[in-house]
């Protein structure tokens, strides 16, 4: 199944003036891919490694309930990314809209990109040189994690967080053993199984605990999802 993540709507179903942070756990969230009534353009990162970073950044945003939706405070996510260095580490209530969140994910992935909205997104992202030329999404399009989708006219933008494997994607290298002194760090699967049993508590506390323990919450959650299928 193809899954996309995005900043969607505030806690009252409005676009502006909501309370900072995700009040419903659905303001910034993942959902199954859907056909938009305005149609989608696809912007695919040229490098598989960059695509993976973009997709992971969006998962981090969807898991971090400090990030909510508000067009009037859309630059909050950008400012907090500069302050904390990573979306998963943002530790104060802030806001984003769909395009500023996509921008933040691209910045975290190492792409130098300025401001844009859904009207200018295609041209701005193409000019970075990090993406292939935009194409129209059809029924035959196989979407991959890290793909950026934006409506053909001003509307909405999302990032694919789960999808088909890229043809150029190499197998991920096995992680090196943790050389830190003391108790060995648990594997991601061990932690995922502990989360399922409730040992790590609930979000947002769980996310903070994972970060402090040296884990990337999005990677752990991906394993949790697989174990629960």
Go through each PLM region and give its residues.
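Short alpha-helix capping/helix-loop boundary micro-motifs
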Residues: 131-139
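Extracytoplasmic Gram-positive cell-surface binding/anchoring modules and repeats
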Residues: 194-207, 215-217
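Repeat-associated, polar segments at repeat-unit boundaries in modular proteins
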Residues: 176, 213-229
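N-terminal capping segments
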Residues: 1-109, 153-156, 162-164
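Loop/turn positions that initiate beta-strands
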Residues: 143-147
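Low-complexity, Gly/Ser/Thr/Pro-rich intrinsically disordered linker/tail segments
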Residues: 165-181
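Extracytoplasmic/secreted envelope proteins and their assembly/folding machinery
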Residues: 51, 55-59, 99, 103, ...
């Amino acid at each position: 199944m193809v899954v996309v993540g995005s900043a969607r709507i505030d806690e009252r179903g409005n676009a502006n003036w909501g309370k900072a942070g995700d009040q419903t756990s659905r303001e910034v969230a993942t959902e199954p891919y859907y056909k938009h009534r305005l149609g989608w353009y696809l912007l695919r990162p040229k490098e598989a490694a960059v695509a993976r970073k973009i997709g992971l950044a969006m998962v981090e945003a969807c898991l971090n309930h400090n990030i909510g939706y508000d067009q009037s405070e859309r630059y909050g996510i950008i400012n907090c990314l500069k302050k904390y260095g990573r979306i998963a580490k943002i530790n104060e209530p802030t806001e984003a809209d769909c395009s500023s969140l996509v921008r933040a994910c691209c910045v975290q992935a190492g792409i130098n990109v300025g401001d844009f909205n859904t009207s200018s997104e295609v041209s701005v992202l193409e000019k970075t040189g990090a993406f292939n030329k935009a194409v129209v999404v059809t029924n035959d399009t196989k979407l991959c994690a890290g793909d950026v989708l934006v409506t053909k006219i001003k509307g909405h933008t999302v990032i694919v967080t789960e999808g088909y494997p890229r043809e150029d994607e190499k197998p991920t290298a096995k992680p090196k053993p943790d050389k830190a002194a003391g108790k060995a760090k648990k594997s991601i699967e061990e932690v995922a199984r502990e989360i399922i049993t409730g040992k790590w508590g609930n979000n947002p506390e769980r996310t903070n605990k994972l970060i402090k323990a040296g884990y990337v919450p999005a990677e752990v959650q991906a394993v949790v999802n697989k174990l629960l299928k």
